[in-house]
Amino acid sequence: VPQLDSEPEVEQIGEVSEDVPLEIPAKWKWVKLENLSREMADGPFGSNLKKEHYTNKHEVRIIQLSNIGEHGWRDENVKYTTHTHAETIPRSRVNSGDIVIAKMMPAGRAVIVPDSDASYVLCSDAVKVVVKTELILTKFLNFAINSQIFKQQVYANVQGTTRVRTSLSKLKTYQIPVPPLEEQSRIVAKIEALFSQVEKISV
């Protein structure tokens, strides 16, 4: 994707580690994920969202690890909790358009929450990212989190042996390469076009 001379250089937001993953174009900047987010929070402790809190009514959709696919949202394992219970775990509430990241199995994969349900909450093993869209496009950030650049940072710092996991505090510190917004838009369009071609070939 070509760079345009007319595009401004990205402003550096927050501190950047000297140990950056790779060299990037001059107008891009490395920015920690927490500095690209209005809010980052993880799901409730297991005792705060148990089967006894589930409901058969379509009230507040619970985002399960199985919904966070490696290639997008997977609409399976559908479970709901009540509006009343969701109000007791406000930091774990999620809106459509937010990004959610799995903390395990495998750690670091991310999806954009769809608008198929009116309201959502996280399971205990996921993290929500409310994107600062004035700095980075949601689709671009989602692609960046799912890239090898981000995954290498995650897997260099995972915990556990049988159930390898990451954490909210670690995810906040990992770095994202941020181009100017217009260039982000062109990159997203190019990636989506390539995915579309792959889907046509695989059909």
Predicted features and spans:
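Non-catalytic DNA-recognition/assembly elements of restriction-modification systems
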Residues: 14-45, 177-203
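Short, well-ordered beta-strand elements within core beta-sheets of diverse protein domains
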Residues: 20-23, 85, 127-131, 172-178
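Specificity-determining recognition surfaces
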Residues: 144-176
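Sequence-specific dsDNA recognition surfaces
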Residues: 14-19, 34-52, 66-96, 116
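A short beta-sheet element
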Residues: 64-65, 83-146, 163-165
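Extended, domain-scale alpha-helical bundle/helix-rich regions
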Residues: 1-12
